[in-house]
Amino acid sequence: DDARADAKVPRREKGRARVAALLEAAGAEFAEKGFDAATMTSIAARAGASIGSLYQFFPTKDVLANALLEAYLATLIGDFERLREEAPALDAAALAHRLAPALVAFRAAHPAFAPLVETPGRSLPAAAGVRQRFRREIAAVLSAKAPGMKTAQALVYAAVVQQLMKAAIAIQGETSFTHRAAVIDELERVMASYLETVLGGR
């Protein structure tokens, strides 16, 4: 599989800066045009780099897309890890306030994320098991808040939270609906009530 080939990891600061610029350009191209329509030539041009420089670090578009998705996932997982550390000090409402809009905000900040994860007929290695991985991260946050919770139960609760987060994404995608923010606030309220129930006021 082309996407499983290795991207070249630069050793020098200049090389790392170049790779960061190439990934940023790739994100803009994928978000604007979609995976299939974006080309290595257009990505290099947007980055102000030569096509040879792009191929030096990323031999195929699949490798480039997979590297970008891995970077996005590392950022998102880092966000969950920070929330896990803070969870014991948060009540249900504060926890819901952090969780309910989290993926909406992340996708807005990284618009190429959805096309890379959801491209029909194409599955990047980094996209494998993404939903299950998010569910485990949510479960870890809930377990940090309620240390005595069994793993299986945490995963059930996490799946409910995940569905509410997906509902927030769905309503945010209805751009013709002018009350999207109000609906997301209501979803947060529903999540807070649910967390208050399942966490038992912990």
Q: Which residues fall in each region the model found?
A:
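N-terminal intrinsically disordered/low-complexity leader segments
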Residues: D1-A17, L199-R202
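Pre-recognition alpha-helix immediately N-terminal to the DNA-recognition helix
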Residues: A21-E29, T75, R98, A102
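Alpha-helical DNA-contacting segments of helix-turn-helix folds
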Residues: S42, A65-Y72, A127-V130, F134
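Amphipathic alpha-helical linker/stalk segments
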Residues: L68-L95
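Amphipathic alpha-helical packing segments from all-alpha helical-bundle domains
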Residues: I77-G78, A94-A109, S123-G148, L155-A159, ...
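Amphipathic C-terminal alpha-helical segment
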Residues: F113, A140, A144, Q162-R180, ...
